[in-house]
Design a protein with these regions (language model features):
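Glycine-rich, positively charged N-terminal anion/phosphate-binding segment
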Residues: 3-76
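Conserved, mostly hydrophobic/aromatic
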Residues: 13, 24, 53, 80, ...
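Hydrophobic faces of well-ordered beta-strands that scaffold small-molecule active sites
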Residues: 21-23, 51-55, 78, 120-124, ...
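Glycine-rich phosphate-binding active-site loops on the catalytic face of alpha/beta enzymes
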Residues: 24-27, 82-84, 154-156, 202-221
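Catalytic cores of alpha/beta
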Residues: 61-72, 132-140, 189-209, 216-218
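C-terminal helical cap(s) of enzyme catalytic domains, especially alpha/beta-barrels
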Residues: 162, 216-232
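Single conserved hydrophobic/aromatic residue that forms the stacking wall/gate
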Residues: 300-309
Length: 309
């Protein structure tokens, strides 16, 4: 997820039980042009493994070159994003946009598989719209092109994130007797109960969680504990949320520098304190303050209201 699954956030998910993580998706053209922001997204760390680098683009040659550049960072997996529905990506033929040209999608995948000595995986959607839900055939063809796993979001590109994710076609992919690679489901899993129900009902090999982890890195341990015991872990306390936000801020400052670290962290605070009635009195300071020391004190004040600034 762009601006989410970066090095400042990933350690929080790893500590909370995430089994496999991916970088933010990285533009193939940005990598080829050696754009600083794209290159920085290649940063991965030993403590994060296993981890995949995810790339996107619309041109086969550029994607092959980007795959070779990415492979030099030695991720455990190289992932191709054929699922991003955002207009500026999809309408240029990248991300979910390539679902309008399946032969090109297959050719691009084969080029990337042949270009690197890493397992290649794919993240995609059911189709471009309700009339092109060809995911069962597409998954089979991508497997034949050499991918080692596929993650499927249960919506079309046209749906964006509206309505409910439809996992029935994900199950159809899993039940296809020709499919020999792992099939992971994605979409709307934000509780342990949903994770267990979807795994059992749709027979997937695993579950990919995206939006459900934003401001909630605890979801991974919560789900795994529920799978193992049928019981819920305690919900994170206010102090837990403050500590997670503090660590996220510190990691952001370390990786992005003072200015960007402060500014780009602002989008995350509300997610950590969602549902907390007294958060609104702290929000303005968190999204306007530039001094990390004051930000740290502001976070502490959320769990210790009587502590002076």
């Amino acid at each position: 997820m762009e601006d989410v699954s970066d090095p400042p956030f990933r350690p929080l998910c790893k500590v909370q039980g995430c089994d496999m993580m991916y970088t933010e998706f990285i533009s193939s053209e940005g990598l080829i042009r050696d754009a600083a922001k794209s290159r920085q997204k290649l940063d991965i760390y030993e403590k994060e493994r296993p981890i995949g680098i995810q790339i996107f683009g619309s041109e086969i040659d550029s994607m092959r070159k980007a795959a070779e550049i990415s492979a030099a960072s030695r991720p455990d997996v190289l992932d191709i994003n054929y699922g991003c529905p955002v207009k500026k990506v999809a309408c240029k033929g990248a991300g979910a946009g390539i679902l309008q040209d399946i032969p090109k999608m297959v050719s691009m995948t084969k080029e990337i598989v042949d270009a690197v000595d890493l397992p290649v995986t794919v993240k995609t959607r059911l189709g471009w719209d309700d009339n092109t839900k060809y995911i069962v055939e597409v998954a089979e063809r991508l497997q034949d092109a050499g991918i080692q796993a596929i993650s499927i979001h249960g919506r079309t590109r046209s749906q964006m994130y509206k309505g409910e994710a439809d996992w029935t076609l994900i199950r159809a992919v899993r039940e296809n007797p020709r499919m020999a690679i792992p099939v992971f489901g994605n979409g709307d899993v934000d509780t342990p109960e949903k994770a267990l129900a979807y795994r059992n009902e749709y027979g997937v090999d695993g579950i990919m969680i995206g939006r459900g982890s934003i401001g909630n890195p605890w979801i991974f341990d919560q789900i795994k504990h529920y799978f193992a015991t049928g019981e819920h872990l305690p919900q994170p306390t206010v102090a837990d949320r403050v500590e997670a936000a503090r660590q996220h801020l510190d990691h952001s400052l370390e990786w992005k520098g003072l200015r960007l670290g402060v500014v780009e962290m602002r989008r995350h605070y509300a997610n950590y304190f969602r549902g907390l009635s007294h958060f609104k009195e702290h929000r303005l300071r968190l999204v306007t303050e530039d001094d990390p020391t004051v930000l740290h004190l502001s976070l502490i004040h959320i769990s210790e209201p009587t502590r002076p600034y």
